[in-house]
């Protein structure tokens, strides 16, 4: 699925998104993530920020391995409710264990703190969109 330029622009201007995964026992999990859009896919790296367990045991990793259907959302809130909007990307996630320099470089450009982290060899979540829902007056 091709992501429109309008949606790409909004994705590229947002620094936080939320990823929803579901376990094989249908237990949902939503977490905030750093992300980029590249070639109509969403990417997030399993970086080296402090974690209480090894990366391969993270709930999102286990959920993706057992159920690759995910949902990803960015949104905008304002006290003027006519300005509210969201973009929800539903898709299939996969874990990539080989570095993709274009993804790593774009993540470092978007999130300068990654310059001080060794992220080149970290696993990457790749979301391939199957549908996109958007809501808000800006889209009408």
Model features per residue range: what roles?
Residues 16-36:
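Active-site and channel-lining beta-strand-loop segments
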Residues 7, 56-63, 100-103, 107:
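Amphipathic alpha-helical interface surfaces
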Residues 32-35, 61-62, 91:
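Hydrophobic/aromatic beta-strand elements that line small-molecule binding cavities or substrate pockets
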Residues 2, 77-140:
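Charged, gly/pro-rich active-site loop segments
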Residues 11-23, 69-74:
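A short, Trp-centered hydrophobic/proline-enriched beta-strand micro-motif
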Residues 38-77:
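A short mixed-secondary-structure module that forms the rim of ligand-binding clefts
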């Amino acid at each position: 699925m091709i992501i429109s330029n309008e949606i790409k622009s909004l994705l590229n201007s947002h620094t936080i998104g939320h990823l929803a995964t579901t376990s094989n026992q249908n237990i949902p999990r939503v977490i905030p993530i750093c992300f980029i859009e590249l070639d109509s896919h969403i990417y997030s790296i399993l970086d080296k920020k402090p974690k209480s367990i090894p990366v391969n045991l993270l709930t999102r990793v286990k959920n993706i391995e057992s159920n690759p259907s995910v949902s990803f959302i960015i949104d905008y809130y304002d006290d003027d409710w006519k300005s509210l909007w969201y973009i929800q990307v539903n898709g299939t996630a996969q874990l990539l264990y080989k570095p993709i320099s274009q993804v790593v470089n774009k993540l470092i450009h978007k999130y300068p703190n990654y310059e001080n982290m060794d992220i080149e060899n970290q696993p990457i979540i790749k979301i391939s969109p199957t549908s996109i829902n958007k809501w808000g007056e800006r889209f009408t």
